[in-house]
Design a protein with these regions (language model features):
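N-terminal capping segment at the start of a domain
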Residues: 1-23, 114, 140, 297, ...
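Zn-dependent metallopeptidase/amidohydrolase metal-coordination segment
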Residues: 4-6, 69-70, 325-375, 379, ...
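Active-site-adjacent substrate-binding region
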Residues: 7-8, 149-197, 235-239, 300-352
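A non-catalytic alpha/beta surface segment that caps or lines the substrate-entry region
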Residues: 10-57
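A short beta-alpha structural unit
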Residues: 18-22, 250-260, 270-277, 294-311, ...
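A generic, well-ordered mixed alpha/beta core segment in the N-terminal half of proteins
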Residues: 76-147
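Midchain, well-structured core segments that form catalytic/ion-binding scaffolds
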Residues: 115-116, 122-280
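His/Asp/Glu-rich mid-to-C-terminal helical/loop segments that flank catalytic regions of hydrolases
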Residues: 215, 219-244, 351-389
Length: 389
């Protein structure tokens, strides 16, 4: 299934993917999702926040169901597995259950959450945040991409109705349990399949360092107000302070104005991603770095601890050779975290990543581990929908 979509949004030079939300690549992937649903006789539909759902059974008649899935968008120059592995595995797990003649006692759905990475509009998990009401629809509509297009304009151009964005209780009420399968994004998982215990609290902050543009040659050092220096200090401080606090901090995106090689900049805008096991330490780091910059919090996701009873049960079912699957925390954000925070019983399965590389073209999972992931997911779906084959 991943081979079907391996060319979509791929940079042939680097092998990296660019699948921004609502780009033509994303539209193609959404179509692929709908096609996969139709091929299996699942009822697919797009909710008013742009998330896709493919139902086996009817949740409006049979009550809330078990939802599995992930996302299809990518970071810039991302890998092939982050997101699509969870969507493809969800369809495959349903195939496996049906092949066994399994009849679930409640509906099962495959979900694809829109704009999980936030690569285009800066806020991650836009689809699940809107669905659960943690992202204000007015704020969402006014988010702009680098070309200056607002989400409102982009959705309108794609024939959607941005006026309908916002918390969607009707859709949410259909989700009894959510299980997301995802490629592991570090090297912590040694077994083929693992289960998430928690997601570190994490956020993104925009730092605006302001100065005065001037000539790179004729302006004496004592006359300069160069924001690049403040930015450079912040980058180095982020690293040292993060190590001191036991958290992770990264400036991964920067924009310079006016961006001339022979001029002192007037403005350096940089984005800090910071996360760690303890909220206070992440917060303390951001406060320490804020000197000399105007700081705007663009997103914040509190720590998520997955339902303990559910994760223990999932680990038992997803284990191999009679051993429960290992349970581990993750430093990566996921739609599963947003749903868990909204009170939906939620679990996550991870598929081993041999190199730990993620959000980069080298992201990889062995095909046999992906198959183990599908088998584990199918076993979890069967266990949670209680029927027998
Ligand atoms: Zn992901």
């Amino acid at each position: 299934m991943l081979a079907d979509i391996e060319q979509i949004g791929r940079n042939p030079r680097t092998g990296g993917y660019r699948r921004d939300a609502w780009s033509s690549a994303d539209m193609e992937l959404r179509e692929w999702f709908t096609h996969q649903a139709a091929k299996r006789g699942l009822t697919s539909h797009e909710d008013r926040n742009g998330n896709l759902w493919a139902w086996w059974g009817d949740p409006s008649v049979q009550g809330p169901g078990l939802v599995t899935g992930s996302h299809l968008d990518s970071v810039r120059e991302g890998g092939a597995f982050d997101g699509p592995l969870g969507v493809a595995s969800a369809f495959e797990a349903i195939d496996l259950l049906r092949g066994d003649g399994f009849q679930p006692d409640r509906p099962i759905a495959v979900a694809c959450f829109t704009d999980e990475e936030g690569a285009r509009f800066g806020v991650p998990c836009i689809g699940s945040r809107l669905l659960t009401g943690v992202l204000d629809p007015d704020r969402a509509r006014s988010l702009r991409d680098e070309q200056g297009h607002s989400l409102d304009e982009v959705l309108t151009a794609r024939g959607r109705q941005p006026g309908r964005l916002g918390r969607d209780d009707e859709t949410l009420a259909r989700v009894g349990v959510f299980v997301e399968l995802h490629v592991e994004q570090g090297r912590a998982l040694e077994a083929p399949v693992g289960v998430a215990s928690a997601i570190w609290p994490h956020g993104r902050w925009r730092f605006d360092f302001r100065g005065t543009a001037d000539h790179a040659g004729t302006t004496a050092f004592e006359d300069r107000d160069d924001p690049m220096l403040a930015y450079a200090h912040a980058v180095l401080a982020a690293r040292t302070q993060a190590e001191a606090h036991g958290v992770r901090a990264t400036f991964g995106k920067v924009r310079v104005e006016p961006n001339n090689a022979n001029a002192i900049p007037s403005l350096v805008t940089a984005w800090l991603d910071a996360r760690g096991p303890e909220t206070e330490k992440v917060r303390a780091l951001v406060t320490e770095l804020a000197a000399g910059a105007d700081v705007t919090e663009e997103s914040w996701t509190p720590e998520v601890t997955f339902d303990e009873v559910l994760r223990t049960r999932v680990a038992c079912v997803a284990g191999l050779d009679g051993h429960p699957a290992p349970i581990l925390p993750t430093a990566a954000g996921h739609d599963a975290g947003i749903l868990a925070s909204a009170g939906v019983p939620t679990a996550m399965l991870f598929v081993r990543n041999p190199t730990g590389v993620s959000h980069a073209p080298g992201e990889f999972a062995e095909p046999r581990d992906c198959v183990s992931g599908v088998i584990a997911l199918a076993a979890v779906l069967a266990d949670l929908t209680g029927g027998g084959s």
